[in-house]
Swiss-Prot record:
Enzyme class: hydrolase
Lineage of source species: Bacteria, Bacillati, Bacillota, Bacilli, Bacillales
Protein name: GTPase Obg
Gene encoding the protein: obg
Cofactor: Mg(2+)
GO molecular function: GTP binding; GTPase activity; magnesium ion binding
Length: 428
């Protein structure tokens, strides 16, 4: 089964917790704090594997959670960083954040990697908090939570040439005679429901990859007839071969077919119209095809170059392949998305946390709810089993301006304040 879109959940590993410890050794009368830092949590890293062709594997495993870092230890020993979780994807995979729609990565070349969910940093041990006024701190941090998100994976086939046109115009037949591909061919519409790829050799030491894409119908750009799933695969192609049934046996006018398909390409993505398009008049071995071709030429004008062929008899196919190969040599690639500098095959896509530091809302029962990335991260990294850590958290809240903001919202002694699933009393 060809699977070209799937939703999965990824989570970077939490950082290891820092430790509260002290040196208790002979001849070390003032040993001091010796708690080590926690190790960094593992990242979730997507890596391109050229042997993969679909996203089928993700139908059976949709959750990817990286390991947390090792906890800090006594004698100042830091926890070990966890090994990154490598997730293999096929070439041509686009990764989007499900919530925001942001493009996280466009993975096209073998071995290319992208960090999709960062692991959290390790919490600091108490040796990090020693000062002249507090030489033996009872403070250690929990590990930072790893980033988590739902992502959408879309596979857009990597082909130099895309065959487009209405259903049953002969795209699959053409691919089968110019390559070793064996797409399903039958006398009914939408025989092809997934892209088929074939390597085409022109006979003069040139070759390219051609994709037979499922047939389009009017309204495809808006999703009619699974149009979005089909048009998605055209985006990476450099040359579009527009196949038209010149026999008219389906009862459609070839010129109207030509106009309709081009409108769909334009409406779906303006950049599709920037690609060179080769117009192929297929089924020229059928009755009335020559007459229909002349009428078609009169309507499109002389500026549109047309290649009359018969995919069944292979008439005109050789000239068509040479023209396509020439266009590929002179046409640059069309990048789909603007991503980070690709000079390095390893790309880091950072999690944007800029914006509102915290937000205060009030529930119907009068409870004040504090939310926001910074305050929630600080809360999770606080070890509430130690009084000194609790006092430090209170200072951090004041430093963020949360105390003042609560007072401004009318908070008084004894009011309930909630962060995540935890509640405590406000003390003025």
């Amino acid at each position: 089964m060809f699977v070209d879109q799937v939703k999965i959940y990824v989570k970077g590993g939490d950082g290891g917790n820092g430790m509260v410890a002290y040196r208790r050794e002979k001849y070390v009368p003032k040993g001091g704090p010796a708690g080590g830092d926690g190790g960094k949590g593992a990242d979730v890293v997507f890596v391109v594997e050229e042997g993969l062709r679909t996203l089928m594997d993700f139908r059976y495993q949709r959750h990817f959670k990286a390991d947390r870092g090792q906890h800090g230890m006594s004698k100042g020993q830091h926890g070990r960083k966890s090994e990154d979780l490598l997730v293999k994807v096929p070439p041509g995979t686009v990764v989007k954040d499900e919530k925001t729609g942001q493009i996280l990565a466009d993975l096209v070349t073998h071995g290319q990697t992208a960090v999709i969910a960062k692991g959290g940093r390790g919490g600091r041990g108490n040796s990090r908090f020693a000062t002249a006024t507090n030489p033996a701190p009872e403070i250690a941090e929990n590990g930072e939570p790893g980033q988590e998100r739902d992502v959408i994976l879309e596979l857009k086939v990597l082909a130099d040439v895309g065959l487009v046109g209405f259903p049953s115009v002969g795209k699959s037949t053409l691919l089968s005679v110019v390559s070793s591909a064996r797409p399903k061919i039958a006398e009914y519409h939408f025989t092809t429901i997934v892209p088929n790829l074939g390597v085409v050799e022109t006979g003069d030491n040139r070759s390219f990859v051609m994709a037979d894409l499922p047939g389009l119908i009017e309204g495809a750009h808006a999703g009619v007839g699974l149009g979005h799933q089909f048009l998605r695969h055209i985006e990476r192609t450099r040359v579009i071969v527009h196949v038209i049934d010149m026999s008219g046996l389906e009862g459609r006018d070839p010129y109207e077919d030509y106009v309709t398909i081009n409108n769909e390409l334009k409406e779906y993505n303006l950049r599709l119209t920037e690609r060179p398009q080769v117009v192929v008049a297929n089924k020229m071995d059928m009755p009335d095809a020559e007459e229909n071709l002349q009428a078609f030429k009169e309507k499109v004008g002389e500026e549109v170059k047309i290649f009359p062929i018969s995919a069944v008899t292979r008439q005109g196919v050789r000239d068509l392949l040479f023209e396509v190969a020439n266009l590929i040599e002179t046409t640059p690639e069309f990048p789909i998305h603007e991503v980070a500098d690709e000079s390095d095959t390893s790309v880091m896509y950072k999690f944007d946390t800029e914006g509102v530091k915290f937000e205060i809302t009030r529930e119907s029962d009068g409870t004040f709810v504090i939310s926001g990335y910074d305050i929630e991260k600080t809360f999770k990294m606080t070890d509430f089993s130690r009084d000194e850590s609790v006092r430090r958290f209170a200072r951090q809240m004041r430093g963020m301006g949360i105390d003042e903001a609560l007072r401004a919202r009318g908070a008084k002694d004894g009011d309930i304040v909630k962060i995540l699933e935890y509640e405590f009393e406000f003390i003025d």
